[in-house]
C-alpha cells in the first residue's frame, strides 16, 4: 500500500514522502497513529499543493536572506579597543558584533555566526549563516582607541 508520510519516521522516510509499505503496517499503525495517509488522487493533489507552497516559501526565504546579505556586506563594522603601548585590553566578541548589527532590526542570533570569534586589532571576515544556502561575509575592522 502506498502512503504519504505526515511526519519524519527514521526507518521509513521524511515528511511528505510517498512510500510503499505492507497493507497491515499502513492500516494498523501508520494511518491509525496519524503518521501517514493513504495515497489517493485527492491526497496526491493536497500533497502537490503543500509542496508548491513550501517551495514558494523556501524561495522567498532565500530571496530575503540574499537581500539581507547584500545589505550586511555593503559597509564594514568598526570597533575600537583600548590599548596601552604594547598591550590590548579585551577583544571583540560575537555578542558585540550581533548587538551592533541588531541596532536597526532584530534579525541576527548568536547561532547564525558559524565560528566563534574573539577578534583582536586588525581586519577580520566573519561569516553569518542567514539561510542554509546563503552565507554573508561581514567585514569587521578593529582598531586602537
UniProtKB/Swiss-Prot annotation:
Keyword Protease belongs to the record: no
GO cellular component entries: ribonucleoprotein complex; ribosome
Domain of life: Bacteria
Pfam families documented for this protein: Ribosomal_L9_C, Ribosomal_L9_N
Keyword RNA-binding appears in the UniProt entry: yes
Sorted UniProt keywords: Ribonucleoprotein, Ribosomal protein, RNA-binding, rRNA-binding
GO process terms (BP): translation
PANTHER family: 50S RIBOSOMAL PROTEIN L9 (PTHR21368)
Function, as annotated: Binds to the 23S rRNA.
Protein name per the record: Large ribosomal subunit protein bL9
Species the sequence originates in: Ureaplasma parvum serovar 3 (strain ATCC 700970)
Amino acid at each position: 500500500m502506498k502512503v504519504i508520510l505526515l511526519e519524519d519516521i527514521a526507518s521509513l522516510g521524511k515528511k511528505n514522502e510517498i512510500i510503499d509499505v505492507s497493507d497491515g503496517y499502513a492500516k494498523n499503525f501508520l494511518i491509525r497513529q496519524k503518521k501517514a495517509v493513504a495515497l489517493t488522487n485527492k491526497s496526491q493533489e493536497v500533497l502537490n499543493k503543500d509542496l508548491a507552497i513550501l517551495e514558494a516559501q523556501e524561495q522567498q526565504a532565500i530571496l530575503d536572506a540574499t537581500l539581507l546579505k547584500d545589505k550586511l556586506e555593503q559597509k564594514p563594522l568598526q570597533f575600537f579597543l583600548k590599548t596601552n603601548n604594547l598591550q590590548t585590553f579585551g577583544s571583540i566578541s560575537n555578542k558585540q558584533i550581533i548587538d551592533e548589527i541588531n541596532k536597526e532590526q532584530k534579525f541576527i542570533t548568536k547561532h547564525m555566526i558559524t565560528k566563534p570569534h574573539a577578534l583582536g586589532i586588525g581586519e577580520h571576515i566573519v561569516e553569518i549563516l542567514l539561510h542554509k544556502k546563503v552565507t554573508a561575509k561581514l567585514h569587521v575592522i578593529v582598531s586602537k582607541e
